[in-house]
Regions:
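Boundary at the C-terminal end of the N-terminal hydrophobic targeting segment
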Residues: 16, 20-22
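Soluble non-transmembrane domains of integral membrane proteins
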Residues: 22-181
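Bacterial N-terminal signal peptides
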Residues: 5-15
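Channel- or pocket-lining gating/hinge segments that regulate access to a cavity or pore
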Residues: 177-301
């Protein structure tokens, strides 16, 4: 009888131990991750690559960094080239890093470019989601407010941070993301990209005030400005971005401006046609009325073309 009681107690103790281990195994390590952006390097609009200087902090009451190395982390969308200023405490680990990262760019609004400068940190095997879970450490996350944190030609917006889960055939993992949105300067884009193009088109539009007797000179002006507009479009407006299979906003604006050249050329040809048909009846009054119509119709057609390309 005593032997049976001892066996029963031993079995119960084994079950208790197994349950304890099961509970311990089911309790993942909670680790707070913080990223503070110190500086932003070059942004390559063609490849979507960008260089970042930042601090990474790892905080966990469940992890002793003095007794074991920090969990291995993977920078999903780039690589770290240099790590310095490592600081280790019992439940705190921090280092400074410099790395190059990549993110997809949508060029549909070019040259009003927008890019999310993101850093994605993911745990790796054996630290699946049931072993390690990231949390956002707001205390050590952000971007320095000093004036040297800037990118020429870009405006830096407020960063944001979040944690998500990534599922793969080999397991589910925790991922921490830091995102710094940047946008092209609106004023700079208008002055550098669109004002020159509009000025070139204005030369073509000005031919409506040149008398029809100078039609050869008008054609020369139109030809020269059209070549200049095409050259500007291809070599400057489309510079710095890859060849894409859709129209950018710059392409749509240029298509509407090409309408001005087309209407101006049609105006010259109509004057030639009327001059040939009416001969002595082709008066200054007829010429002036035709020019007035084209001065009104040309901007209307240009706006219609722009709206069509934007909407469709």
């Amino acid at each position: 009888m005593k032997i049976l009681i001892l066996i029963a107690l031993f079995a119960i103790s084994l079950v208790s131990i197994d349950n304890a281990f099961a509970e311990e195994a089911k309790t993942p390590i909670k680790m707070k991750i913080g990223i503070e952006i110190m500086n932003i390097g070059e942004i390559n609009k063609e490849t979507g690559a960008y260089e970042l200087f930042f601090w990474v902090s790892e905080t966990s009451d469940d992890y002793d960094f003095t007794k074991q190395p920090p969990p291995i982390i993977d920078y999903e969308n780039g690589y770290v080239e240099e790590i310095t200023a490592i600081s280790v405490k019992e439940h705190f680990y921090k280092f400074k890093a410099r790395g190059t990262f990549f993110n997809a760019m949508d060029y549909r609004e070019h040259p009003f470019n927008k890019l999310n400068l993101a850093i994605h940190i993911k745990s790796v095997i054996p630290n699946t989601l049931d072993n390690l879970q990231f949390e956002v450490d707001q205390k050590f996350s952000g971007i320095r407010k000093e004036s040297f944190v800037s990118v020429p030609g870009w405006e830096i917006k407020d960063p944001y941070f979040f944690v998500s889960n990534q599922t793969y055939p080999w397991g589910e993992f925790s991922r921490f993301s830091a995102v710094v949105p940047v946008e092209s300067s609106t004023t700079g884009v208008i002055l550098k990209y669109f004002v020159p193009a509009i000025l070139i088109a204005a030369f073509a539009f000005s031919t409506y005030w040149i008398p029809a007797s100078y039609s050869d000179e008008k054609i020369e002006i139109l030809a020269a400005t059209l070549v200049g507009a095409i050259f500007y479009h291809v070599t400057y407006l489309s510079a710095g971005i890859p060849s894409v299979q859709y129209l950018t906003f710059a392409d749509k604006v240029m298509l509407s401006l090409y309408t001005i050249f087309g209407m101006s050329l049609i105006n010259v040809l109509l004057h030639k046609k009327l001059e040939h048909e009416l001969k002595e009846n082709y008066t200054v009054v007829v010429e002036r009325k035709l020019n007035i119509k084209f001065r009104i119709l040309t901007p209307i057609f240009a706006i219609i073309v722009l709206l069509i390309t934007i909407l469709f």
